[in-house]
UniProtKB/Swiss-Prot annotation:
Name of protein: Anthranilate phosphoribosyltransferase
GO cellular component: cytosol
Keyword hit for Glycosyltransferase: yes
Signal peptide: none
Gene: trpD
Requisite cofactors: Mg(2+)
Organism per entry: Janthinobacterium sp. (strain Marseille) (Minibacterium massiliensis)
Positions bound to 5-phospho-alpha-D-ribose 1-diphosphate: 84, 87-88, 92, 94-97, 112-120, 124
Entry keyword set: Amino-acid biosynthesis, Aromatic amino acid biosynthesis, Glycosyltransferase, Magnesium, Metal-binding, Transferase, Tryptophan biosynthesis
Gene Ontology MF: a single term: magnesium ion binding
Length: 344
């Protein structure tokens, strides 16, 4: 007999794990609309209070992947997602979005999965729209965007229709639940490589192990000690790295790469217009904290994608792409191609 919803709640109350097959059953009920809003709220809050285990998160992510609308890609060589869980409260500009243009111009292929703002003043979808890109492409056109530009953006609501059953509950609860950490684990293009920023240090070890269970190829999970869900310039960054099935955990410092430490307040923005200005500052090679943090994150992404042999090698490639104008040109190309595909 499959686990009942009440049994699952009792497990949470007793701080006992819900096993893999049981989580698959429960989350399939959520995604197919068979669980009531009251039970969705109770289960997700119960898991939060108990603290979700690696196995529980992996099973829930597996179900979200099952129910997602996929981007049809046959070749995933050097394909990478650059994504954050959000919720770090740092209100910085869209560092991962800017990094995506740099990484793509240096040889990575990007399948970025994102939505509107969670914690920042503007989410990746908000800022890409303000840059002029079309974020609402159909899955086959996202694949075409990757083929033409090396970048595809997958607007999360377009790929996770089954989440409509949980969305009102999440909104009304207004607190973090397991869903906040599932989004970055459910790339609809099946990107085997990922650079993921997380909002809490405990999630570094958890998410890298979840990605291991989900079969990721090269994953780098980061949390900056100044509470940033990026590779930070303002403090040390905790890293969980999965490569060839093995996990390493370590710290990196800006000084390791000859970079000056700069407080994250220098990267704060109030809205997507300010975020856009910082992105241009970085991509136009203006000597600034914005350029340096984008280069460092893009360099880490190039390493995760298998285009660079190390973060330091990736940083050198990222700097060269910015200095040559290739990164800014990639942004312009992406905007033009997504607009054209949207009219096709």
């Amino acid at each position: 007999m499959p686990i009942t919803e009440q049994e699952a709640l009792l497990r949470c109350i007793d701080h006992r794990e819900i096993f893999h097959d049981e989580m698959l059953h429960l989350f399939r009920k959520i995604m197919s609309g068979e669980m009531s809003p009251v039970m969705i709220a109770a289960l997700t809050m119960g898991l939060r209070v108990k603290k979700e285990s690696i196995g529980e998160i992996a099973a829930a992510a597996q179900v979200m992947r099952e129910f997602s609308t996929k981007v049809p890609l046959t070749d995933t060589t050097n394909l990478l997602d650059i994504v954050g869980t959000g919720g770090d409260g740092a209100n910085t500009f869209n560092i991962s979005t800017a990094s995506m243009f740099v990484a793509a111009s240096a040889g990575a292929r990007i399948a970025k999965h994102g939505g509107r703002s969670v914690s920042s003043s503007s989410g990746s979808a908000d800022v890409l729209e303000s840059l002029g890109a079309n974020i609402n492409l159909k899955p086959e056109l996202v694949a075409e965007s990757i083929a033409q530009t090396g970048i595809g953006f997958m607007f999360a609501p377009n790929h996770h229709a089954a989440m409509k059953h949980a969305a009102p509950v999440r909104k009304e609860l207004g607190v973090r639940t397991i869903f906040n950490i599932l989004g970055p684990l459910t790339n609809p293009a099946g990107a085997p490589n990922i650079l993921m920023g997380v909002f809490h240090p405990d999630l570094v070890g958890i998410q890298v192990r979840v990605l291991q269970r989900l079969g990721a190829q090269h994953a780098i999970v980061v949390w900056g000690r100044d509470n940033m869900d990026e590779v930070s310039l303002g403090a040390a960054t905790m890293v969980g790295e999965l490569v060839n099935g093995e996990i390493r955990e370590y710290e990196i410092h800006p000084e390791d790469f000859g970079l000056q430490m700069i407080a994250s307040r220098n990267l704060k923005v109030a809205n997507s217009v300010e975020s856009k200005a910082k992105i241009f500052e970085a991509l136009d090679n203006v000597d600034s904290p914005a350029r340096d943090i984008v280069a460092l994150n893009a360099g880490t992404a190039l390493y995760a994608a298998g285009v660079a042999s190390s973060i330091a090698d990736g940083l050198a490639k990222a700097r060269a792409a910015i200095a040559s104008g290739a990164a800014r040109a990639k942004l312009e190309q992406f905007v033009q191609v997504t607009q054209a595909l949207g009219k096709a």
